[in-house]
Amino acid sequence: LFLTSRSQPAFLLIGFNAGANDYVTKPFDTSEFLARIRTLLHMKRSVRERLDIEMAFIQAQIKPHFLYNTLNTIASLSEVDPDRTRDLLADFGSYLQSSFDLRNLDQEVPFEKEWTLVQSYLNIEKARFGSRIQLTTEVPDEAEFVLPPLTIQPIVENAVRHGVLKKIEGGHIHISVEEIGDYAWISVRDTGEGIPPLKREAILDGTYRLGIGLVNVNRRLKNTYGQGLLIDSVEGTGTLIRFRVPLKQNKEAER
C-alpha cells in the first residue's frame, strides 16, 4: 500500500511495478486507510490458507499402495540383506519427513532439500523394480538455488509411474540441472510411453482431472515465476519435462 498525491496512471504504474498492491491518494481519510490495510492483511491470510490447503492436498495424494508396497519391500529385504534394509529404511524415513514438512508452505526451499527427497524416492522405487528403472543424473555439486517445495519429485514420479513402468522392460530416466544465463534449468527425461497430446494440453491448461501432480506443479511455478512446465513428448518414445528457476532472485536473496 502506498500514498500518493498524484492519481495519473503513469505515476500509479510506477508504484505497482515497485511491488504495491493498492494505493491511497492524499489527502486521505484515516478510516479508509485503515480499512484498506485490513483488506490487504485479510487477502494475505487468505493466500496463506489456500497454500496450506493446497499443500495438504498434495501430500494427501501420496498413494496408500506406495506406502504398503514400500513396507513390503523392506520386510522382504530384511530377511536376506540387513544392510540394504537399513539404507532403504533411511530413505523411506527421509521421504516421509520431506513430504510432510509443513514449515515452508509459502516459501521456497534449497535445491539440496528437494534433491534429497528425489533421491530417497528413486532409491525406494529402484529397490522395488530393480533394472526396470535405469537412472542417470547430471547435477552439479555446487548447485545452490531455491525453488518451491515438492516441485521436482512429482515430475520424477510421473516419469517412473506413467513413463518407464508402463513398458514391460522399463526404461531410462535422466535428470539434469544446468545454469544457463540467469536461470537454473531442471530437466527430467524418460524413455517411457509418452504423453498423448490432449492429455499434455489438459495438464498445461489445468483441466486434467485424473491426477493432480503435474497440474499442481505447473500452476505453482506459474504463480511463482510467471512460467510453468515445458513438456515435449512423443507417444511410445518418451517425455522431456523442463522448468526454470531465476538465479538472479536467488543471488539477491543471498545479499
Identify the meaning behind each predicted range.
Residues R6-S7, L40:
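Short, conserved "switch-loop" micro-motifs in signal-transduction and mechanochemical regulators
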Residues Q8, L13-N17:
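Alpha4-beta5-alpha5 "output face"
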Residues A10-F11, P27-I37:
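C-terminal output helix
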Residues T25, R38-I62, F66-L230:
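Two-component histidine phosphotransfer core
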Residues G171, T237-T239:
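Glycine-rich GHKL/ HATPase_c ATP-binding element in histidine kinases
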Residues I231-E235:
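A short beta-strand-to-loop motif within the catalytic HATPase_c
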